[in-house]
Structures are given as C-alpha cells and as structure tokens.
Amino acid sequence: MRNILLTIEYDGTGYFGWQKQPNKKTIQGTIEEAIKKLTGEEVNLIGSGRTDRGVHALNQKANFKTSSKIPTDKFPLALNSVLPGDISIKDAVEAPLDFSARYSARQKTYKYLIYNKKSRPALLRNYAYYYPYQLDVDAMQRACEYFIGEYDFKSFCSADSEAKTTIRRVYNAYLTFENECIAIYITANGFLYNMARIIAGTILDVGAGKLKPMDIPLIIESKDRTKAGKTLPPWGLYLVDVVY
C-alpha cells in the first residue's frame, strides 16, 4: 500500500466545487473516476481543502491510498491521459502512510483577482471579479497589512461555517498586479468558510472608499459579520499553494 500525494491545477468553472456530491460533476469525483480507470480501485481522494463551485486551483494538494503497481512518477502523465482538459495533475510523490493532505497542512495561500477597468472583460469573465469603478490601491495595500497576525476572524466567516474555532493566523497579506488584474494574496494557517472572499470584499470596500484601512482592526474586534465587506463571487478566487 502506498500513499500518493498529487499536486493539481484546475479550472473550477464547470464543476460543483471540490467535494464529491451525488449526481453532480465535482473535481474530487472526476479525479477519483480517473484513478479507478487506471488502477481499478475505488479510492478516497483527500484534498487539502474543499474549494467551492467556480473556485480555481493552481496547486491543490490531495492524497489517496493505492495498491497499484504504477510508478509514482508516472501518475501525472497517466491520469492526465484520462482526465478532462480543465484538470491537470502537475506532480505526484509518495507520502508517509499517515500523511493527510487536509490535516497535515500547515499553511495555505489564496489569491483573489479583481479586473479594474471600465470595459467588461470577455476572456476573464470566469477568472476575475469585474469592478469598473476607481479604486485607491494604496489604501487597499494598507488594509492588507491589518489582517496579518493571529485574530478571531468571526467577522470574516459565513454564518453556516462548521469550524470549531474562528481563530486563525494570517502570515501574509498583500496586493500586487498580474494579468491586468489587482491580485490580493493571503497566506494563513487555515481559512474559515468564505474567509478569503470576505477579506477580499472588505479590501475592495477600502479601495472604493466605503471603509478606511484603520477600520479593519475594529471590524476584526467586533466579531460581527455585518461589519465586513460582501462575499465576492467564487470565480475570482484561486488556491495558490499548500505548505506541509
């Protein structure tokens, strides 16, 4: 028996999120079917996190147990030969049998892309949030810095979260530019349900002048979801990296 850790890139547009659901096309379900085609085994693919419908991943991590004789380094090519084009296995390594892509993770990085131009993008419509109004990028950068540290992020968590605690440590948060978009990067030891999208929505409100950067500590302290910005749509969000 081996424990195989995959690094996966996917376009979440056509899927109902990561987690397997009855009669719905999901990332987990699609990859498990591909593994079954190769090995004949029914496996349980454990992802580092359950990305929502429409969310993308550059380096999602997931592990599964197998008795297959396929060499570990051959799994990417073999799986990609049977997977659809919007899912790609980038790497495969053998992990210890007690390793879990979910529970062994120490930190994750997400980014959120905002397309801030007057004209609506056609090619980026499923890959960035369109915001045509003027933004104060310097204020947004200052707002990012207030998120760094260990806090109770209850204000930045959807009400239907099942988390045992809302305390998380944010290691880094910053703003940059890429692919004609504003990119908000957040690295933390874990993310609450919709936390990255709510933080991005709050930073956007700062850029729009609805909030000030120094409002962020007050919003965190309030532990009140209504004080933070809206939850931005899923299609601007990307799982960038997972560290073990």
From Swiss-Prot:
Give the quaternary structure.
Homodimer.
The beginning of the lineage is: Bacteria, Bacillati, Bacillota, Bacillota incertae sedis, Caldicellulosiruptorales
Q: Alphabetically list the UniProt keywords.
A: Isomerase, tRNA processing
Per the record, the similarity remark reads:
Belongs to the tRNA pseudouridine synthase TruA family.
Whichever gene encodes this chain, its name is truA
| Keyword Nucleotide-binding tagged | no
Protein name as it appears in the record: tRNA pseudouridine synthase A
What is the native source organism of this protein? Caldicellulosiruptor bescii (strain ATCC BAA-1888 / DSM 6725 / KCTC 15123 / Z-1320)
Superkingdom of source = Bacteria
Per the Swiss-Prot or TrEMBL record, the active site comprises: 52
What's a Gene Ontology MF term here?
tRNA pseudouridine(38-40) synthase activity
NCBIfam families attached to this UniProt entry? hisT_truA
Q: Which InterPro entries match?
A: PsdUridine_synth_cat_dom_sf, PsdUridine_synth_TruA, PsdUridine_synth_TruA_a/b_dom, PsdUridine_synth_TruA_C, TruA/RsuA/RluB/E/F_N
Pfam families recorded:
PseudoU_synth_1
Q: Which reaction does it catalyse?
A: uridine(38/39/40) in tRNA = pseudouridine(38/39/40) in tRNA
Keyword Endoplasmic reticulum listed: no
Top-level EC class: isomerase
A single GO BP term for this record reads: tRNA pseudouridine synthesis
Per its UniProt record, what SUPFAM superfamilies does this chain match?
Pseudouridine synthase
Q: Which residues form a coiled coil?
A: none
- Write out the residues that bind substrate: 110
Q: What is its EC number?
A: 5.4.99.12
- Described purpose of this protein according to its UniProt entry: Formation of pseudouridine at positions 38, 39 and 40 in the anticodon stem and loop of transfer RNAs.
PANTHER family found in the cross-reference section: PSEUDOURIDYLATE SYNTHASE, TRNA PSEUDOURIDINE SYNTHASE-LIKE 1
